[in-house]
Amino acid sequence: MVRNLEDFCNEANAKHIRIEDRERYTGHFNALKDMVYSYWKKSKGLDKLVKGTTLCGGYGDNLKVSKPDEYDLLIHLVFPENDKIIVKADASNPGNVLLDMTKVMEIIAKQEHNKPVFDLLQKIVNNKKQLLEDKLQSFLHGIMTQTLNKMGNRIEVQGEISHLSYKKCGPAHNILVKGPCEYSVDFVPAIKLSAAQLVLAPEQRKHFGGTLYWDAVPKPMKPAKPDNPSFRTSFYEAERSLLHGKQNLKSAIRMIKHIRNEKNKANLKSYHIKTVFLWQVMEKDASYWEKPKKEILIEMLGKLADLLALTPRKGRLPYFWDPKLDMFADLTDDQRTDMFNCFRKCEYVFRKADGNLNDDNENSVHSSFKGSGRNGQKMEKTSTESEQKKPTETKPNAKVESTPVKPNPKPSVQEKQAKPNLADQKKCTKNANGTKSKTTTPKPS
């Protein structure tokens, strides 16, 4: 019997925010990851660039909730003479950088063993020798298409066949798996750069700390722009360090993500939530995260609502690594109003329950974590996107070995309800840091 709100938060973490079939899904994912990676490593030109992967997103941060049906994988690309890439901030696009390959090309033009890379670069840079996002992605799209064709658009794991479909979505190359395990993987290419190549402002440079590497992700502009030299910065490793060791921080993030999923607020991306907490890590003393989960949850729900508020000057969510970029800029007023009302109401419900967790208040809190209350009442739908609810995030067990893969057989023959936005329902969206989203419509990731 739950006796107070803190007990309820602990129970919610144990009962509702859990991973089912973790090992089975992880083994299957590892098999697919290894096979795709091996084909990329065999591709002419790309073979010299591919230098490892990083599991990121909810799994990498240990922030995923619910089913293990969505993975984000950075595929690191490192050019010969990579440290000679001249990185400049893109003044026209906050949070983005330009990659000047002039010195790299001057050196490798004289190296016979790097001729395939030089030939590739000649096709994917402009007349200023700046690397072009769309040209690089077009090349990788061809590689991934060939990869799926060679695999017969299927994979066999432990004697069971799963069918694969591929689509390009934002910066990600997404593979949807249908079979005994159904999930999707975003393969996100990322140019791996060193700390010496940072172009951060002094304050943000301080947050980067002792991290050795960061990435430039070929994220398309909105709308798509041909011959685009602008790449989105990504600081996954530095962010992981900033969130590490903050006792109840990750529990609070998981609870907010779970509430978002249950309320079907797919326009609020996981990276939005993560960014709210990154800013709070800078503002709060380390001891703050040792407070009870309920206190952190209530305050963070309030912070989130404040940022979504349509005030005369509008709330905004600055990108942690370049505050000139507002991560809420692409949201419509209806979307913001819908989410503001949702999270402000949740804040009110939790504050009320914290003062008096009677049966009615407990049922209201319960409804925030599940689709129905204790007595089985159906939770009122709070979003016009309720039919597009997307599953949530958690970290796979790193100790699970990749499952053996057999060769593939040949294929057999403020209170207004936001209005539905059909364009939003159809388009692919990505994590605001440029490394996912993920890929269904619209994706909460």
Swiss-Prot record:
Mg(2+) binds at residues 70, 72, 186. Its cofactor is Mg(2+); Mn(2+). Residues 377-398 have a biased composition (Basic and acidic residues). Keywords: Antiviral defense, ATP-binding, GTP-binding, Immunity, Innate immunity, Magnesium, Manganese, Metal-binding, Nucleotide-binding, Nucleotidyltransferase, RNA-binding, Transferase. Residues 435-445 have a biased composition (Low complexity). It catalyses: GTP + ATP = 3',2'-cGAMP + 2 diphosphate; GTP + ATP = pppA(2'-5')pG + diphosphate; pppA(2'-5')pG = 3',2'-cGAMP + diphosphate. The keyword Manganese applies. One of its GO terms (biological process) is cGAS/STING signaling pathway. InterPro entries: Mab-21-like_nuc_Trfase (IPR046903), Mab-21_HhH/H2TH-like (IPR046906), MAB21L/cGLR (IPR024810). PANTHER family: CELL FATE DETERMINING PROTEIN MAB21-RELATED, CYCLIC GMP-AMP SYNTHASE-LIKE PROTEIN-RELATED. This is Cyclic GMP-AMP synthase-like receptor 1. It comes from Drosophila erecta.
